[in-house]
């Protein structure tokens, strides 16, 4: 234990760099791919330096590391023998940084366990900003920076990139997992419990208002899984989902345009008297193509970015 404290004091600047970059990730993801990719690269390089300096070999000899290295080797071999090796290797070779990033997070949890609670707070603040700005844009037609809503679809700080729903639906599992890991801090206090309830409901409604049908499907699918499989939190998710659906029903009753895009158009695209589709004809064609590629390359696949 004393050796870990010694390492932390000796390398405080580098550990704090990793710490703050991880806390800023929820915000940097809103800006686009460049800043989060740069952050992950800096975190990975910093951890490599700490690994060499402090001989952190245990992290690299774990079962997780061995599994990843096998996966990484197979991934690059697949890229090498793919239809366009150069294009595929551009993706598979740099994938290694995500492995180092995961090890850096693992290391940080060991030397600074409070990172999990701090990351949860960071995600909550980021989601609150997006949610408040999103509802502001929905009501007034523009967000607090004056960026106008695109048609009826809410995008908040993503501007003309209509991915607000995708962001919320994909960060939600991390958010809820961290809530469970910090159970004593959040679920034993009524204010935080109410805050989580509002966040869950707001994420559902705002994903609907973003007009992203796939994201809305994911968020509802995760809600159903949580309600069915969770023991301690199913009532919280059930009531937050019910409240969100009531709000969505109210919104669609006032403005039927939202219902037409998310519900009516989806039902229309899923099938007609002649042919039935999975979500839409475009989705179905993607699934058929993916299945054919799988049947032709069952063991290795066709390589990253070769779809």
Predicted regions and their residues:
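Interfacial juxtamembrane loops and adjacent helix segments
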Residues: 145-151, 266-280, 305-307
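Membrane-embedded alpha-helical segments of multi-pass membrane proteins
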Residues: 31-53, 92-104, 164-175, 216-224
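Non-cytosolic membrane-interface motifs at loop->transmembrane helix junctions
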Residues: 87-94, 150-155
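Alpha-helical transmembrane segments of multi-pass inner-membrane proteins
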Residues: 23-25, 72, 76, 100, ...
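Extracytoplasmic loop-helix module adjacent to an early transmembrane segment
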Residues: 42-46, 282-297
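Extracytoplasmic catalytic/substrate-binding loops of multi-pass membrane glycan-assembly enzymes
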Residues: 37, 96-97, 274-287, 298-307
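A membrane-periplasm/extracellular boundary helix in multi-pass inner-membrane enzymes
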Residues: 117, 209-210, 230-275, 288-296, ...
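Transmembrane signal-anchor hairpin modules in multi-pass inner-membrane enzymes, especially those
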Residues: 1-90, 107-121, 178-194, 235-239
């Amino acid at each position: 234990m004393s050796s870990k404290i010694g390492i932390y004091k000796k390398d405080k600047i580098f550990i704090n760099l990793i710490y703050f970059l991880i806390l800023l990730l929820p915000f940097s993801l809103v800006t686009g791919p460049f800043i989060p990719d740069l952050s992950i690269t800096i975190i990975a390089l910093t951890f490599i330096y700490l690994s060499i300096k402090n001989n952190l070999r245990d992290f690299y000899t774990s079962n997780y590391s061995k599994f990843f290295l096998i996966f990484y080797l197979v991934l690059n071999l697949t890229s090498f023998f793919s239809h366009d090796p150069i294009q595929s290797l551009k993706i598979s070779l740099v994938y290694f940084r995500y492995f180092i990033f995961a090890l850096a997070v693992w290391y940080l949890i060991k030397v600074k366990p409070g990172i999990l609670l701090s990351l949860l707070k960071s995600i909550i603040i980021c989601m609150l900003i997006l949610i408040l700005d999103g509802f502001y844009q929905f009501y007034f037609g523009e967000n607090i920076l004056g960026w106008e809503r695109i048609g009826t679809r809410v995008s908040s700080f993503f501007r003309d990139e209509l991915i607000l729903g995708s962001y919320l639906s994909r960060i939600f599992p991390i958010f809820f997992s961290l809530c469970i890991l910090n159970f004593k801090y959040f679920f034993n206090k009524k204010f935080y419990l109410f805050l989580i309830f509002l966040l869950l409901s707001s994420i559902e409604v705002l994903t609907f208002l973003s007009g992203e049908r796939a994201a809305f499907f994911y968020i509802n699918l995760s809600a159903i899984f949580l309600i069915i499989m969770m023991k301690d939190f199913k009532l919280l998710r059930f009531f937050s989902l019910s409240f969100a659906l009531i709000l969505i029903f109210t919104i669609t009753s006032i403005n039927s345009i939202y219902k037409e895009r998310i519900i009516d158009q989806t039902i229309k695209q899923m099938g007609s008297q002649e042919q039935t589709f999975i979500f839409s004809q475009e989705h179905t064609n993607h699934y058929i193509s993916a299945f054919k590629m799988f049947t032709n390359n069952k063991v290795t696949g066709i390589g990253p970015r070769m779809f």
